[in-house]
Amino acid sequence: MASTVRQRTVRVNGVDLSLREAGDPGAPLVVLAHGFPETGHSWRHQMLPLAAAGWHVVAPDQRGYGNSSAPREVSAYGTDELSADLLGLAELLGHERAVYVGHDWGALLLWDLCRMHPDRVTAGVAASVAFADWPAPPLDIMARRYGDRFFYINYFQRPHEAETELGRDVADTMAKVLWGASAGAQADPMFFTRDELPPMEGTGFLTGRAQPPALPWPWLDEEEFRTYVDEFSVSGFFGPVSWYRNMNANYERTRHRPVAAMTMPVHFVTGELDPVNLTNPAFDSSMRATLPGYRGSTVIAGAGHWVQQEKPAEFNAALLGFLSSL
């Protein structure tokens, strides 16, 4: 069973989730949760190594992405529904508890799972986005911080505008976003300091992004890229940007849940050149002081934001090393 990746669609929590699956269905379960803008395809380098190590591994296209259901209500993308999707998937596969691995938005969802449902998470690995216990609604903080300057999360709050821009030319969008946050690119404009950012008015998510080099890249070939384009051509971008539109609602759902209950073992992995953590250099010390079950971090040299794709061997070594310690 460990030698192939299987694909199927399951009905969970009122939505259809398309998933990739490998390993023995009777083995311990690990659920891989992708981020923005990705799908279960982003875990292609992890599926078989995890299965070979004795895990039953599933990587769903999360709601709004790829070939999974994409509800048209913004509220359908709150962390309560997203968490119920993953917990329901585990239950469907016969598991009350599972190991969860999340990248980018998948990492944010992992942190919420650990905080809201600590009894359902055996252990967790977060990639690229560290745990943060926001002191106030995060969208309010970002609105004050950036004011009239462009910041992509604030831009994503604008109804219709962001998803229309991103969906206009899916291949161009995916190429610029995937290249722009990788180690091979120069610093992406959306991560500059406030004074260096352009004005919000008249600026889009793709404005000013460099034209990527022709494929293949060291970590992504033409066929792998085309899979992303095909999947986002199906789903569009309303669902993906709607995850961002729930950030304040997610804060309200989680803020009274004690961080002290997050006692499950957790590990953090990031790329040395990930622009998210270049702006958050204290991520390790902050989590070490905050999370009871924190087991340290792995910083992977030469990797950008797409760490599990850019440096799969190094990422897998960190992931499997952590799992073997459980």
PLM ranges: what are they?
Residues 6-12:
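Short acidic-hydrophobic surface loop/beta-edge motif
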Residues 24-25, 93-96, 326:
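Glycine-rich phosphate-binding loop signature in dinucleotide/nucleotide-binding domains
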Residues 36, 40-43, 55, 105, ...:
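Signature tryptophan residues that serve as conserved aromatic anchors
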Residues 3-5, 16-17, 65-97, 101, ...:
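Flexible "cap/lid" subdomain of the alpha/beta-hydrolase fold that forms the substrate-access gate
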Residues 15-69:
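Conserved HGGG/HGGXW glycine-rich cap/lid loop of the alpha/beta-hydrolase fold
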Residues 294-326:
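Catalytic active-site module of serine/aspartate enzymes centered on a nucleophile-bearing elbow/loop
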